[in-house]
C-alpha cells in the first residue's frame, strides 16, 4: 500500500523526543495517562487553551511548543468533545485530526490513547489508528517536485500508548486490512485514464489472487459468447476493449449462497457520441468509482479472512466517440435477452451494469446483490455529496445498509422505486430505452437496473456525489474517497459473516 505512515502500539512511557499528542474533552479534562504524561505542565496547557480560546471541541487542536518539564519538542492537544458519548466513527475522525496535525518534521509521534472517561479499549485505539492511516493517505506518485511540507503524516512513525498493546494490535489487524481496501479503491479512482484503462484495471484486480481470491477475466470474445450486448455496445468505440472481472472469496461454508457486489467501471467517460461538455471532463476518470469500491472490498474481505462467501463483479469499459462508437437510435440486446434503445450514449453505466447484474444473478444465485455506480448527476442534485442514493427491492437489506451507513459515516438515503416511473423508459422500438426525462433521473436509472436482477434481493447505491471530488473531511484529503468499502465491509461483518 502506498501510505508510508507507520502505526504501532506500546505501553505508555514518557517520550524523550518528538511530538506528544493527548486528548481532552470539551471541559478541558484529560485522562489519567495524559495527566501523568503532562505532569506539572497541565496548568500551563490550560492557560494556553484559555488564551487561544481552545474549548476541546471534537477534532479541534491546540498546538504548542512543549512546556518546560516535557522532553518532547512539540505538544498537541486534540479535542474529543463529549467523551462520554464518543462512538467508533468519532474515534476514526479523531485519528484523522491527529494525522492532520502531524507535520513533515514529526518523524516520531506518541499519541496517548486515553480519555477522561478512562483508557481506550483496544477497539477504540484501533479506530484511532485507522483514522490516522486514512487521513495520511495522499496520491502524489506523478509529482516529480514535492514541497518539503507536503508529506505531513505520510512519513511519520506514530505510536499509540495503550493499556494493552497486544490486544490493540489484534483489534487493529482486521481494521488495517479494511483501510488497505479503502486505499486501494482511492488509488484506482485517482489514477489517470491513460494509465488505468480496462485491461490494466483487470490486471490490478487479478492481483487479489495473492490473497486467495479466485479471479476470472472475461474478454470481448467471452462476453460476445455470453451475449453481453449492452456492455459491449458501450465499449465498441474505444481502442481499449472492455473486460468483465469476476472475483470470488470463499471464506464461508462450502455451497453457501454468496453475497454479491457489482461495480460500474467506466474507466473514462466522454459521453460517447452524446459527448459531455469539456469543462471538468477530466473528472470522468473517476467514473469507475463503483468498480474501485468492489475491488477494495474484496481485498478487505480476503485479507481479514472474512467468514463468508462473496462475489465481486466489475464491468470495465471506456465510453469514447470513435467512428465505431454506439449511436443514439441503436438497439442492443442485453445478456438477459431484453432489448434496449439507446437514446443517450452518456447514459452508459446502466448498460454496463445491466449485463453484469444479470450474469451474477444467473451464474452465482447470490443471497443478495449490491451494485455501486457513479450513475447520475441527478442524485447529486437531490442529495449533494454527503449521502449516496439507496434504491432497493428489499426492505431488510435497505434497513441494514442504512444502519451501517450511520455507524461508518458512509451515509445512504433511501430513494423511491415504483412502476409509475417505468413509463419514462418505455420505448416505441425496443423493450426499453436507456434514459427517460430529466425528472427523477436517478430513480428511472434504478428502475432500469431493477429489470436485470431477476428477482434477487438487490440494492443500488448511486455514489456519483460521494466517490470522487467530494469535500475533504477528517479522514480523507484525497480526490478519490474510497466510499463504500467500509460501508459494505461493516454490512458483511455485522449481519452476514459467521461468528467465531
Curated annotation (Swiss-Prot):
<feature type="binding site">
    <location>
        <position position="348"/>
    </location>
    <ligand>
        <name>Mn(2+) 1</name>
    </ligand>
</feature>
<feature type="binding site">
    <location>
        <position position="269"/>
    </location>
    <ligand>
        <name>Mn(2+) 1</name>
    </ligand>
</feature>
<dbReference type="GO" id="GO:0030145">
    <property type="term" value="F:manganese ion binding"/>
</dbReference>
<feature type="active site">
    <location>
        <position position="276"/>
    </location>
</feature>
<dbReference type="GO" id="GO:0005737">
    <property type="term" value="C:cytoplasm"/>
</dbReference>
<keyword id="KW-0464">Manganese</keyword>
<feature type="binding site">
    <location>
        <position position="287"/>
    </location>
    <ligand>
        <name>Mn(2+) 2</name>
    </ligand>
</feature>
<dbReference type="InterPro" id="IPR011356">
    <property type="entry name" value="Leucine_aapep/pepB"/>
</dbReference>
<feature type="binding site">
    <location>
        <position position="264"/>
    </location>
    <ligand>
        <name>Mn(2+) 2</name>
    </ligand>
</feature>
<dbReference type="GO" id="GO:0006508">
    <property type="term" value="P:proteolysis"/>
</dbReference>
<feature type="binding site">
    <location>
        <position position="346"/>
    </location>
    <ligand>
        <name>Mn(2+) 1</name>
    </ligand>
</feature>
<dbReference type="InterPro" id="IPR043472">
    <property type="entry name" value="Macro_dom-like"/>
</dbReference>
<keyword id="KW-0031">Aminopeptidase</keyword>
<dbReference type="Pfam" id="PF00883">
    <property type="entry name" value="Peptidase_M17"/>
</dbReference>
<dbReference type="GO" id="GO:0070006">
    <property type="term" value="F:metalloaminopeptidase activity"/>
</dbReference>
<feature type="active site">
    <location>
        <position position="350"/>
    </location>
</feature>
<keyword id="KW-0378">Hydrolase</keyword>
<keyword id="KW-0645">Protease</keyword>
<feature type="binding site">
    <location>
        <position position="269"/>
    </location>
    <ligand>
        <name>Mn(2+) 2</name>
    </ligand>
</feature>
<dbReference type="Pfam" id="PF02789">
    <property type="entry name" value="Peptidase_M17_N"/>
</dbReference>
<keyword id="KW-0963">Cytoplasm</keyword>
<protein>
    <recommendedName>
        <fullName>Probable cytosol aminopeptidase</fullName>
        <ecNumber>3.4.11.1</ecNumber>
        <ecNumber>3.4.11.10</ecNumber>
    </recommendedName>
</protein>
<comment type="function">
    <text>Presumably involved in the processing and regular turnover of intracellular proteins. Catalyzes the removal of unsubstituted N-terminal amino acids from various peptides.</text>
</comment>
<dbReference type="InterPro" id="IPR008283">
    <property type="entry name" value="Peptidase_M17_N"/>
</dbReference>
<dbReference type="InterPro" id="IPR023042">
    <property type="entry name" value="Peptidase_M17_leu_NH2_pept"/>
</dbReference>
<dbReference type="InterPro" id="IPR000819">
    <property type="entry name" value="Peptidase_M17_C"/>
</dbReference>
<feature type="binding site">
    <location>
        <position position="348"/>
    </location>
    <ligand>
        <name>Mn(2+) 2</name>
    </ligand>
</feature>
<comment type="similarity">
    <text>Belongs to the peptidase M17 family.</text>
</comment>
<keyword id="KW-0479">Metal-binding</keyword>
Amino acid at each position: 500500500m502506498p501510505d508510508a505512515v507507520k502505526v504501532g502500539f506500546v505501553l505508555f512511557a514518557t517520550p524523550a523526543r518528538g511530538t506528544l499528542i493527548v486528548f481532552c474533552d470539551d471541559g478541558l479534562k484529560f485522562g489519567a495517562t495524559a495527566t501523568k504524561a503532562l505532569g506539572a505542565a497541565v496548568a500551563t496547557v490550560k492557560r494556553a487553551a484559555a488564551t487561544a480560546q481552545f474549548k476541546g471541541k471534537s477534532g479541534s487542536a491546540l498546538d504548542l511548543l512543549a512546556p518546560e518539564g516535557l522532553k518532547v519538542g512539540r505538544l498537541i492537544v486534540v479535542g474529543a468533545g463529549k467523551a462520554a458519548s464518543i462512538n467508533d466513527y468519532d474515534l476514526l475522525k479523531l485519528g484523522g485530526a491527529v494525522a492532520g496535525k502531524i507535520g513533515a518534521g514529526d518523524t516520531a509521534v506518541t499519541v496517548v490513547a486515553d480519555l477522561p472517561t478512562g483508557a481506550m479499549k483496544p477497539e477504540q485505539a484501533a479506530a484511532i489508528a485507522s483514522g490516522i492511516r486514512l487521513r495520511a493517505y495522499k496520491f502524489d506518485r506523478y509529482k516529480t517536485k514535492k514541497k518539503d511540507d507536503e508529506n505531513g503524516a505520510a512519513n511519520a512513525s506514530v505510536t499509540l500508548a495503550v493499556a494493552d498493546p497486544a490486544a490493540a494490535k489484534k483489534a487493529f489487524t482486521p481494521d488495517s486490512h479494511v483501510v488497505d481496501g479503502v486505499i486501494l479503491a482511492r488509488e484506482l479512482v485517482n489514477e489517470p485514464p491513460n494509465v488505468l484503462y480496462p485491461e490494466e484495471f483487470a490486471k490490478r484486480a487479478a492481483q487479489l489472487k495473492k490473497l486467495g481470491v479466485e479471479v476470472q477475466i472475461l474478454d470481448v470474445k467471452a462476453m460476445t459468447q455470453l451475449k453481453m450486448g449492452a456492455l459491449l455496445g458501450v465499449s465498441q468505440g474505444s481502442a481499449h476493449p472492455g473486460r468483465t472481472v469476476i472475483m470470488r472469496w470463499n471464506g464461508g461454508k462450502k455451497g453457501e449462497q454468496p453475497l454479491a457486489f457489482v461495480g460500474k467501471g467506466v474507466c473514462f467517460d466522454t459521453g460517447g457520441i452524446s459527448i459531455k461538455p469539456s469543462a471538468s471532463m477530466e473528472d470522468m476518470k473517476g467514473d469507475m468509482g463503483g468498480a474501485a469500491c468492489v475491488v477494495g472490498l474484496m481485498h478487505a474481505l480476503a485479507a481479514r479472512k472474512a467468514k463468508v462467501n462473496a462475489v465481486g463483479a466489475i464491468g470495465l469499459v471506456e465510453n469514447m466517440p470513435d467512428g465505431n462508437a454506439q449511436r443514439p437510435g441503436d438497439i442492443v440486446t442485453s445478456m438477459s435477452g431484453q432489448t434496449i434503445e439507446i437514446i443517450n450514449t452518456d447514459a452508459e453505466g446502466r448498460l454496463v451494469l445491466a449485463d453484469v447484474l444479470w450474469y451474477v444473478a444467473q451464474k452465482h444465485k447470490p443471497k443478495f446483490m449490491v451494485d455501486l455506480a457513479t450513475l447520475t448527476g441527478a442524485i447529486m442534485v437531490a442529495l449533494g455529496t454527503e449521502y449516496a442514493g439507496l434504491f432497493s427491492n428489499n426492505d431488510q437489506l435497505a434497513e441494514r445498509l442504512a444502519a451501517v451507513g450511520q455507524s461508518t459515516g458512509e451515509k445512504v438515503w433511501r430513494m423511491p422505486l415504483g412502476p409509475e416511473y417505468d413509463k419514462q423508459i418505455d420505448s416505441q422500438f425496443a423493450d426499453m430505452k436507456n434514459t427517460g426525462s430529466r425528472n427523477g433521473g436517478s430513480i428511472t436509472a434504478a428502475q432500469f437496473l431493477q429489470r436485470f436482477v431477476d428477482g434477487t434481493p438487490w440494492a443500488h447505491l448511486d455514489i456519483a456525489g460521494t466517490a470522487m471530488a467530494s469535500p475533504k473531511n477528517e479522514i480523507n484529503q484525497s480526490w478519490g474517497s474510497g466510499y463504500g468499502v467500509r460501508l459494505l465491509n461493516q454490512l458483511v461483518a455485522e449481519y452476514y459473516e459467521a461468528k467465531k
